Amino acid sequence: MRCPFCGNDDTQVKDSRPTEDNSAIRRRRFCPACGARFTTFERVQLRELTVVKSGGSREPFDREKLLRSMRIALRKRPVDADRIDRVVNSIVRQLESSGETEIPSSQIGEMVMVHLGTLDKVAYVRYASVYKDFREVTDFNQFVETLRTDAPAG
């Protein structure tokens, strides 16, 4: 594995262990050339997935992009990184086991919305504001109002 700091191709694995949910192997690596230490993750990829954008363009599925979008929505919210990672792993497993190789971006967005809806309502609204392309304050008001009316009485 190439060192991300100096580019040396000869790095050493110092420690390997499964992640908490056993979905990946976490490896601590050391670069003898520059002395840097870094972590890599090895994950099973069941199939190559392609995301079909709303305009018809296609791009390879990027787990890190999905993770970044969820982290942005959950920024400064009381949800730990491991929980976010488990949700992303769950979404990826669902996509890979669907049998489809081309996945509409709207399907991924809906899956994220479902998970965020149960995880954190503020993050849910944040994500929805981008996913549903809110343009005015009234768009937020209408969306939040639907959350209130759809919520069970308590």
Swiss-Prot record:
Question: Where does the record place the ATP-cone domain?
Answer: 49-139
Molecular function GO terms recorded: ATP binding; DNA binding; zinc ion binding
Q: Where is the composition biased (Basic and acidic residues)?
A: 11-22
Which chain segments does UniProt annotate as zinc-finger regions (unnamed)?
Answer: 3-34
Keyword list (alphabetical) reads: ATP-binding, DNA-binding, Metal-binding, Nucleotide-binding, Repressor, Transcription, Transcription regulation, Zinc, Zinc-finger
InterPro entries registered for this protein in UniProt: ATP-cone_dom, NrdR-like_N, RNR_NrdR-like
| N-terminal signal peptide | none
Q: Which domain of life is it from?
A: Bacteria
**GO BP, one example?**
negative regulation of DNA-templated transcription
Cofactor annotation remark: Binds 1 zinc ion.
Family, per entry: Belongs to the NrdR family.
Query: So what does this one do?
Result: Negatively regulates transcription of bacterial ribonucleotide reductase nrd genes and operons by binding to NrdR-boxes.
Name assigned to this protein:
Transcriptional repressor NrdR
Classification from the root reads: Bacteria, Pseudomonadati, Pseudomonadota, Alphaproteobacteria, Rhodospirillales
The encoding gene: nrdR
